[in-house]
Amino acid sequence: MDEAWERAVEAALQAAGEGSSSPARSLTLDGAVKCLHGRLPAAEILERYQSLEHLSIAGVGVASLAGFPRLRNLTRLTLSDNRIAGGLDHLVAAGLASLRDLDLSNNRIQDVGDLSPLANLRLVSLDLYECPVTRVKDYRSKVFGMIRTLKYLDKMDADENERPESDDDDDDGDGDGDGEEEEDDDDDEDEDPGSGEVANGGVSHPRGGVASHPVEVNGVIDVDEDESDADEVVPNGGDEHHANGFRVAAVGDEDEYVEEEDDDDEEDYEEEDDLGEEIDEDGDDEDAVVEVHDVPSSSDEEEDGIEEEDEEEDEDEEEVEDDGEEAEPESSGRVALAVGDVGEEIDGHEHGEGEDEDENGEIGEEDEERLEDDRVYEEGNDDDEEDVDDEDEDTEYLVQPIAQPQAMAVGNDFDAAEADDADEDRDEVDDDDDGGTDLPSSSQGAKRKRDDDPSGSGDDDEDDDGVEDLRPFKHH
């Protein structure tokens, strides 16, 4: 078993480039040997390298730290991915006074008390990832309280701020980092921007830019698309001459494009003006020119209102004419009634026997009076028609753009016509009353006639009955 560890150590040193001429400072044995019994190799194999500062034995299945080698200069120890559950006091017994960084992640440490031996070491960083102890309540505060020198637990400080990378390189506290930082400095020196060397055959300028010259291929100039806008800008408004003889102007492409658009617009306007002149010339040749003017909406509304008023007046005139036509049948009806009365009287005379001529003459006078009354009524109707015609003429004469005066004028004329009709009706009633008063005179004349002629008493009685029959009919 020890032989396997010796071969693994020699292979690791050769891979790291460590020779016998210079002492080894770092040794990595991760997974090199599988410990069947969970024990470390013999202490003598590793104690040969007292100059070791970094030792890593991870993933080999170590379960016990008994017999750990004494390495006075060891500052970083990695024992992750093993089966360590306790026995950390063996590290203290090994006299690791320089140890600052201990990695025990992914092991089987379950109790915070198992970490108590580490308080005797001056640890600065302790890693316990994936260990069951990390699930204990207030695990971090307890560990920091136990190990006073500890600054970082699981790569975070007490305030849970991550550990800077510079502290990882300077674990021994002497202020000097490892060789990796020195190698980084060498790489930075190799990439000095002031060397003046530029890839792809470009030429560096003092202002830090790189000017790539255009390449002519088959008469076509190919300019790199990666040219920056800063390279195209010419300082102090001057012109830049390239090596191939081309000159770069300070005017941008956008200004030229805008000027071209302005020229095109001016040409379009000139063409439109020419077309307008041609249209004007053609228009002069035509005799009939139609001009369309926009009429305000208010005037249209007024005209519509006047037309509506005219229509209303026409309707009123038609109604007045209809009233005149209806008045004429009334007059004819009265004449018919008068004629009917006369007819009844005639029938009465026909039925009578032996009436005298004087009696017939009196009845004829009554008929003439009735006919005169009818003529007066007809003349009144004629006057009504003339008034209606005058009203029609007045309405036609009073047509004006204003609606209210016309309506008032028409209304007043109709009121006057109605008043005239009422007066004429009163005159007719008076005439009827006069006709009724004349009837007794005829009856008295008839009585005198009967007194003079006693032989015709029977006929006179019949005549009196006919006259009495006429009275109620007339008054009705």
From Swiss-Prot:
Record keywords = Leucine-rich repeat, Repeat
Start-end of each LRR repeat:
51-72, 73-92, 98-119
**Start-end of Acidic residues biased regions:** 165-194, 222-232, 252-289, 299-329, 353-371, 379-396, 415-436, 458-467
Q: Where is this region: Disordered?
A: 157-476
Q: LRRCT domain: from which residue to which, for each copy? A: 131-169
Q: Does the keyword Nucleotide-binding apply?
A: no
* Cellular component GO terms held in the UniProt record: nucleus
The similarity annotation says:
Belongs to the ANP32 family.
Q: What is this protein called?
A: Acidic leucine-rich nuclear phosphoprotein 32-related protein 1
